[in-house]
Structures are given as structure tokens and as C-alpha cells.
Amino acid sequence: MARTLRYLLCGILALAAGSNAVPAARGSTRAAPAAEPSTSATTYEAEDAILSGTTVDTAQEGYTGSGYVTGFDEASDKITFEVESEATKLYDLSIRIAAIYGDKHTTVVLNGGASSDVSFPAGDTWVDVPAGQVLLNEGANTIEIVSNWGWYLVDSITLTPSAPRPEHQINRSLNNPSADASARALYDYLRSIYGKKILAGQQDLTWADYVTQQTGKTPALVSVDLMDYSPSRVERGTKGTSVEEAITHAERGGIVSALWHWNAPAGLYDTDEHPWWSGFYTDATDFDVAAALSSTDNANYTLLLRDIDAIAVQLKRLRDARVPVLWRPLHEAEGGWFWWGAKGPDPAKQLYALLYDRLVNHHGINNLIWVWNSLSPDWYPGDDTVDILSADVYAQGNGPMSTQYNQLIDLGKDKKMIAAAEVGAAPLPDLLQAYEAHWLWFAVWGDTFINNAEWNSPEVLKTVYTSDYVLTLDEIQGWQDS
């Protein structure tokens, strides 16, 4: 996440997933729930809901009912739907929207508590966007659609009783045929727990120790950032320590994940507004990844190789220490706020392929399990170089993040394990199980998140870390031999 700004908490909470939108197929207006248990869909019209700061309009053609809701121009603007359920039950939620002003995000809040973020694709027509699942109580419930990015139109929501999740069909082996014994052992262990347990994780060893102080339990997984090994940072005096932290956690029986806030190889603005150490942001550099990859003869392509080779040195240290790594490069690419995603999906996928080839085939680094970190099929580099899928989700309420989980199920055809690689709020175990959101691990970001009661209260952390469903460091000892 890069978190001097995370990102000013400005609503960048879930990545775009425009391809998940499906053409509208309506036919019902607001319907009363059936008296007997039903598997049929129920649609609630937005204009019949409770409006706060929003208004009903009819200018956009194609709406259902008597109108639609617009006016999402303030953070507090929302629609509150009052919905009924004949029993405590899980439902698939979809939102019929028109994002006529560009790609958008909204926040869905269930019964005033847990929230999740949903992305809307830009378009000039009405579409039904899958919005995850909601666990309704027997009787009355509320579903709020809260502004977030704002500037979109809402026609209705539809609730359909969720079908039971089928058994996962996870690939039995890693893509790299030369994967070393440590990587294979870790992958086998992860397969053995997937869908049954979740690994508790934390970004940075310092904040893992904070969790131990707060809960009496230590995260099973620690994520480290190779950011300070970027050559454009090293030449300005940074000294990375994350490899040592990773080895420390591995030596006490833990599992290691790594990401890389890749400071751009060149073209850093280095101004008061955009200092050199923020050089992974698109708006802090003029480095053009598409141009750099356009020819192997240009100077910036050579700089890409230089940087990858510098990170290879650090990954080899972990390899030589027999530490397998859940390796998550080019994270959040589809967001566009990092330079590696600034030019669209094709250059990002090309860069990922270069990383894979350079690290695996050129350097022979075989202790890596490759983790991809975007939701949209347009950005997916392909099954052959991705072992695990993941999402970064920053939404308050300690919810199950079922929207993103279900998107990744579809992306990987349920053959890839799925991780919540970065979260702002640790998910509550009871909700994870109720929603059948079988995240492999979660890793809470550090300062301003794990130590912020608005995101992770002490009570919630203790609930999470003492749950039988959540694996902590003491509970995974000997995983290498399992």
C-alpha cells in the first residue's frame, strides 16, 4: 500500500472490476418477500428507499420502476433499503447502476455494521453489478449504499438466496517445475488448510510484535516490503532490513510474504509535493513503463533489469536461508496509482512476465510462490505464472470481503487459492465462515490501521486471534513437515 498517504484514505479500497458487470435483465419491481422459503430473486427500487442527501430523477433512460437515485456528491450521501428475510440467510447482492461519469466505487453497509466496497464500471447504460453477499437476519434488515467516490446513478438492488459453495478444485502443484522443496512444502501446507482455516497475518515484524502485545498471540504470517532495496532509493541512502525481518520470522516457525513498492528506476520528480521516496506513485515520476518495455535496446529497459537483479540479490538471501516466499510483485496494478499500472493492463502484464522470467529462469530463484494482486480479468497475466490470487481491501467494519473473494473465485475458476494480501480491518472469523469467504490468509497493514481502533479495536483483535478458525504462529509449528 505505500502508506504515507494510504492513500489519504481517499476511497481507494478495492480495485476496479469492470468486467464483472453483466447486462441488465430486469422484470420485477419492488416485491414483498415470500412467506415460505424461496430461491427467487427480490428487487428493491432505489426511489422507494430512504434517501439521505440524494434525489430521485428520470433523465437517464432505461430505469425500472418510477425513477432512479442520483446526487451522490457528498461523503455522507446514501440510500437505505429496508429489506426482509424469512430466516437468517445468505443472499447474493447485485446493484443496478449507471456509472456515466467514469469508473466508480461505492460502500455497502449491512445493518449499520460491516461494510464492503464495490467497484462500478464506466458506461452510459444500466448494468447489474455483483456486489458480494449479505447475511440477513430473520425479519427486518437495512442495506445502505453510501457515496464513497460518488457521482453515479442507482436504479435498484436485487437479493437472491445464495447457493452453497461447491468444493474447491485447487491446483495440486506450483507452476514452476523447478520449485524447490521449501516452496513445495509451503504450497502443500496451504492447500491442506484452504477452506478450513485462515492464517493470521501482519505487515512488518514490528507490527506483528504489537499484535502479540495486544492479544497474546503472534501472527502466523508476516509480510515484508522490499521497497528500500530499490536502486533509486539505495542511491539516496536507504538501507533495507526486511530480509532480516523475514528470516527472523521464518526461524521462529512463521510464514513469509513479500511485496515490493518498486521505486521507479528513473524520472523521480523529487519535489516537496512528490519526494523521491514516494517514487512508486504514478504522480511522483515520469517513468513510462510502456515505453521502457517497447524495446530491449532502450536505456530504461536496462534499468528495469538492473532493478529486478537488485531484488534478486535479496530473494537469493531468502532462498539460501531456506525461506519460501509468497511473492507478490506489482501489487494493485489495476488501480493505476503505481507507475507499473499507469499505462494499462498490457504493459503491467508484460512487466510481470519479465519479472517471472528474470527471477525464475535467469536467476534460478525457485523458493517463490507467485501471488497475483488484481481482480480484473483484463489485468490477469495468466494461469501459467500465477500460483495464488489475492486482493487488497481497505474497508472498515471487519467484514468478510465476499465481493472481492467471489470475483477472484471467478477469475481463477476456483483452481487457485485466494488471499486477502492487504487489509485495513482484520475480518471477523464468524463472518468469514458464514459467508464461506475462504481467504487463505489476511495481512493487516501497519501504522494507522492495526493500531487504529476505528479499523481494529482491541476487542476485535482478541476475537480474531483467539478464534479456532484463525491460525496463529503457535498453531502452525512444524508446518514444513505436515
UniProtKB/Swiss-Prot annotation:
GO biological process, one term: substituted mannan metabolic process
Domain (CBM6): residue spans on this chain: 42-160
SUPFAM superfamilies in alphabetical order: (Trans)glycosidases, Galactose-binding domain-like
Alphabetized InterPro entries for the sequence: CBM6 (IPR005084), Galactose-bd-like_sf (IPR008979), GH26_dom (IPR022790), Glyco_hydro_26 (IPR000805), Glycoside_hydrolase_SF (IPR017853)
One Pfam family from the record: CBM_35
One term under GO cellular component: extracellular region
E.C. number: 3.2.1.-
Domain GH26: 181-474
Glycoprotein recorded as keyword: yes
Residue positions with a glycan: N171, N300
One of the record's GO molecular function terms: mannan endo-1,4-beta-mannosidase activity
Enzyme class: hydrolase
Keyword presence, Secreted: yes
Family label: Belongs to the glycosyl hydrolase 26 family.
Physiological role: Mannan endo-1,4-beta-mannosidase that exhibits high activity against konjac glucomannan and carob galactomannan, as well as a lower activity toward beta-mannan. Shows no activity against barley beta-glucan, birchwood xylan, and low viscosity carboxymethyl cellulose (CMC). Has the ability to hydrolyze manno-oligosaccharides such as M4 which is degraded slightly to M3 and M1, M5 which is mainly degraded to M4 and M1, and M6 which is mostly hydrolyzed to M4 and M2. Shows no activity toward M2 and M3 manno-oligosaccharides.
Listed name of the protein: Mannan endo-1,4-beta-mannosidase
Species in which this protein is naturally found: Thermothelomyces thermophilus (strain ATCC 42464 / BCRC 31852 / DSM 1799) (Sporotrichum thermophile)
Designated gene of the protein: Man26A
